[in-house]
């Protein structure tokens, strides 16, 4: 059977299957939603170029729990703090499955810590959390690595001599080096080909997956597998990244000492040796490669993207930048780098960083979840295996939780006495059982990097502050800041 005949047969089978699926639409206890069409689902009611905005608008028509069909796939969408919190935290076990994300799944095959499920996911997460803690995650030892890397970054920024530059690659190299030191055992020089390759693959994939191409692939993966486009580059990048990691793993195998692990890879290899005779073990080479990739991706792109958002925001609001610098000067001075111990004495700076994360909303739709059993929820019944999208943008912009959600306002995280206050609706790392395991590292990096930069430099835009556009470039996987250059002038 040739390719065309196969495609026609698959299309006919899909039509039959979808006709049966949509015949039962609206029956039972599913949440309400727009009526779907066979094959297309609700795509005519959604903008493929901006799925986030379309889903957010539908929540105003159908409420905080509604059903949509992304092509043939039925998805429950949750919006608003109370609803999302009830699902991810109060019913965390029921909503702990990982939903369909074809552009990732076609590479990971459900392997690795981010996209695995069930017992495999629980075992991998428990192991990874323990190993990351052993190598200093959230502790003084990892702080020392961040301070060291921060000093290298400051040296690079000084060499810009106050001239305009694009911060993307400079930030990515520095941020990526921290998670690389945990995974591979040492940092890379900034011109090391391996580091540059890692950053290229990660940055390129994050941009494509945040674009309409990435969104459409997740809706019609079988169709787009036959269509040329930038989505094909994602898989080439994935393959290149896997090869790079595999080379490093082979080098580790040649010098492995199980009694003296140097890094995450050593610990995983040792676990593989220990469970070699167990045919049901989840610790194998493919899992190691996928988990390492997940950690590199998560540990590089989101922090770098958040820092770029912070630069734009601080240039648009120079009074906020000046007040942060004033607090840094008062608490830290100029003779040493800021440390985590300083954070408790810097409530305004802490509030600004949290507000940047809320306002930038870097991962606005979260990664998809899935209910692992039939789940009663807010008067409806969500069938086992149903994918769930939690709109984190509607949490971070919930007017019941934040006084002026559409505005950048550090007062959202300050009490009447100007002391820092937490908000339960702060979920940039998601929440519940699928909470990002890199949260402690990311929070440390954001504080030390931003305060160190503002201690030494003032950020200057190339346009007037009022002309800076904070509207994100993409709203798929990630909210990316629009490309920009800036000048950093030594204070």
Swiss-Prot record:
Transmembrane segments: none annotated. One of its GO terms (cellular component) is intracellular membrane-bounded organelle. Pfam families: p450. It is a peripheral membrane protein. Its cofactor is heme. It is found in: Endoplasmic reticulum membrane; Microsome membrane. One of its GO terms (molecular function) is oxygen binding. Its main location: endoplasmic reticulum. Keywords: Endoplasmic reticulum, Heme, Iron, Membrane, Metal-binding, Microsome, Monooxygenase, Oxidoreductase. SUPFAM superfamilies: Cytochrome P450. InterPro entries: Cyt_P450 (IPR001128), Cyt_P450_CS (IPR017972), Cyt_P450_CYP2_fam (IPR020469), Cyt_P450_E_grp-I (IPR002401), Cyt_P450_sf (IPR036396), Cytochrome_P450_fam2 (IPR050182). One of its GO terms (biological process) is naphthalene catabolic process. PROSITE patterns: CYTOCHROME_P450 (PS00086). Its EC number is 1.14.14.-. Heme binds at residue 436. Involved in the regio- and stereoselective transformation of naphthalene to trans-1R-hydroxy-2R-glutathionyl-1,2-dihydronaphthalene in the presence of glutathione and glutathione S-transferases. It specifically catalyzes the production of a very reactive and potentially toxic intermediate, the 2R,2S arene oxide, that is associated with necrosis of the unciliated bronchiolar epithelial cells or club cells in lung. Belongs to the cytochrome P450 family. This is Cytochrome P450 2F2. It comes from Rattus norvegicus. The gene is Cyp2f2.
């Amino acid at each position: 059977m040739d390719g065309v005949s196969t495609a026609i047969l698959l299309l006919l089978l899909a039509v039959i299957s979808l006709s049966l699926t949509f015949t039962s639409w609206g029956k039972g206890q599913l949440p309400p939603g727009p009526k779907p069409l066979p094959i297309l689902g609700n795509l005519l009611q959604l903008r493929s170029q901006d799925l986030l905005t379309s889903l957010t608008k539908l929540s105003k028509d159908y409420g905080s729990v509604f059903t949509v069909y992304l092509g043939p796939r039925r998805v429950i969408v949750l919006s608003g703090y109370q609803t999302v919190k009830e699902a991810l935290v109060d019913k965390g076990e029921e909503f702990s499955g990982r939903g369909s994300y074809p552009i990732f799944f076609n590479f990971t095959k459900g392997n690795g810590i981010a996209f695995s499920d069930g017992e495999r996911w629980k075992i991998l997460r428990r192991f990874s959390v323990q190993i990351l803690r052993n190598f200093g995650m959230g502790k003084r030892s990892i702080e020392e690595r961040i301070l060291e890397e921060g000093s290298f970054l400051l040296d690079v920024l000084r060499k810009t001599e106050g001239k305009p530059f694009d911060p993307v690659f400079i930030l990515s190299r520095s941020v990526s080096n921290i998670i690389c030191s945990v995974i591979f055992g040492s940092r890379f020089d900034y011109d090391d080909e391996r580091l540059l390759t890692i950053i290229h693959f990660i940055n390129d994939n994050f941009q494509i997956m945040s674009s309409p191409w990435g969104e459409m692939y997740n809706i019609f993966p079988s169709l787009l597998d036959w269509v040329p486009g930038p989505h094909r580059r994602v898989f080439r990048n994935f393959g290149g990244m896997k090869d790079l990691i595999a080379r490093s793993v082979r080098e580790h195998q040649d010098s492995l000492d199980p009694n003296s692990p140097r890094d995450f890879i050593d610990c995983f290899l040792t676990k593989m040796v220990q469970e070699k005779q167990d045919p049901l073990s989840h610790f194998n080479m493919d899992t190691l490669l996928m988990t390492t990739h997940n950690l590199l991706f998560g540990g590089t792109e989101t922090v770098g993207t958040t820092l770029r958002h912070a630069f734009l925001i601080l240039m648009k609001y120079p009074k906020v930048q000046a007040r942060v610098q004033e607090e840094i000067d008062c608490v830290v001075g100029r003779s040493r780098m800021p440390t985590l111990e300083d954070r408790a004495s810097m409530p305004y700076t802490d509030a600004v960083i949290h507000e940047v994360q809320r306002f930038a909303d870097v991962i606005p739709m979260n990664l998809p979840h899935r209910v692992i059993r039939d789940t009663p929820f807010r008067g409806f019944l969500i069938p086992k295996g149903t994918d769930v999208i939690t709109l984190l943008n509607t949490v971070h912009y919930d007017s019941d939780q934040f006084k002026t959600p559409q505005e950048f306002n550090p007062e959202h995280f300050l009490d009447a006495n100007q002391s820092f206050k937490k908000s339960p609706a702060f979920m940039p790392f998601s929440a519940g059982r699928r909470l990002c395991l890199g949260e402690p590292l990311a929070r440390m990096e954001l504080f030390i990097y931003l305060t160190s930069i503002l201690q030494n430099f003032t950020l200057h835009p190339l346009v007037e502050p009022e002309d800076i556009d904070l509207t994100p470039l993409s709203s798929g996987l990630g909210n990316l800041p629009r490309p920009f250059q800036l000048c950093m002038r030594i204070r």
